[in-house]
Amino acid sequence: EDIDEDDIESLLIQQIEFCSTLILNKTDTVSPEQIAELKAIVRSLQKDAVIVEAQNGEVPMEELLDTDRFDFMRAYNSAAWIEAMEHPEEHDDPEVLEYDIETFVYSRRKPFDLKKFTDFVEQEWPDEVIRVKGPLWQTGDPDMCYMFEQAGHQMRLMENGLFVDSAPEGEKQKIIDENPEIMQIWDDETGDRMTSLCIIGRHMDKDALIASLDACLTDWH
């Protein structure tokens, strides 16, 4: 079965996010500056993996076997977008910023008009954006939390469970009692309904992107 180029690009990005060791092969065919630039791009996606340079696929065995590097939960949580969501003010790495790679979190308490958002994503989404992931709120189904994800040129919007605030009052309070951290993002008007997208890009116009996303928002109620 043929695999679409966009699918390969998306798969590679997700593999980088979930790895503990990453091999950069054929480093003898590019300049030191290009290697440094590539490492910066990798670090914008994955903060913790050990990066090993190689030529002709020759990698020391000690870098591959019995390294004790892989830990499932650590790998699961090592993607740079997760760190940025948890610590939105602490993710600017000088190594990454040097190559004009920027990470920011777009958070809003207004829902998206789904048609406007879809039109923007399909027709005007900037190529400079490398990766996006996070919960999204839209008026077509205001009680449902959606997950929006972009990796390379592939984009997906999928259901990710109901917002807690949409539950009946008794059930809502039970969920909050069992998960008190929810109150850290709770709003008196919208509850836990919100959009919070981690956006990673290179040479992107952050202000223009924010303005375009804001133009897709609408009022609720």
Annotate each PLM feature.
Residues 1-189, 195, 204-206, 215-221:
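C-terminal accessory "lid"/substrate-recognition subdomains
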Residues 210:
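Short, surface-exposed ligand- or partner-binding patches at beta-edge/loop junctions that are enriched
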